[in-house]
């Protein structure tokens, strides 16, 4: 992955975590990795554990939102979420939810950030 894309992704994930925190979410961890994949943000909202995939794009149409996180990626996120829950049993009593946050911005051109939060973006596919 080109360095520019990594920086753009890191910017988006940090921005999304701050955005969620200002809305009352408790950020549990970021960039949680296992062999099955990575979850960008794991947060808590009331009695729900929220697994968040963040996509930062320089340009896209909102008509494309349905294909931004494909079925294969969704499955990897779900598998990784199960590993998280197995290793962090204190969250097992909570409901789980999979969200997607899409940011449209190019911080290298000092563009404003346009954010779309899609709660319940997909269901557990495993």
Curated annotation (Swiss-Prot):
Which Gene3D superfamilies would you find in this protein's record? 3.40.1350.10
- Which InterPro entries does the UniProt entry name for this protein? Restrct_endonuc-II-like, tRNA_endonuc-like_dom_sf, UPF0102_YraN-like
Gene Ontology MF annotations? nucleic acid binding
Question: In which family does this protein belong, per the annotation?
Answer: Belongs to the UPF0102 family.
Q: Which PANTHER family match?
A: UPF0102 PROTEIN YRAN
UniProt-recorded name of the protein: UPF0102 protein TP_0913
Source organism of the structure = Treponema pallidum (strain Nichols)
């Amino acid at each position: 992955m080109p360095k520019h894309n990594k920086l753009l992704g890191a910017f988006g994930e940090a921005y999304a975590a701050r955005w969620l925190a200002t809305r009352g979410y408790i950020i549990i961890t970021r960039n949680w990795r296992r062999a099955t994949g990575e979850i960008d943000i794991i947060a808590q909202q009331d009695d729900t554990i929220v697994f968040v995939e963040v996509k930062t794009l320089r340009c896209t149409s909102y008509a494309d939102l349905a294909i931004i996180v494909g079925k294969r990626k969704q499955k990897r996120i779900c598998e990784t979420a199960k590993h998280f829950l197995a290793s962090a049993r204190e969250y097992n009593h909570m409901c789980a939810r999979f969200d997607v946050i899409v940011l449209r911005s190019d911080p290298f051109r000092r563009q404003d950030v346009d954010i779309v939060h899609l709660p319940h973006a997909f269901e557990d596919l495993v």
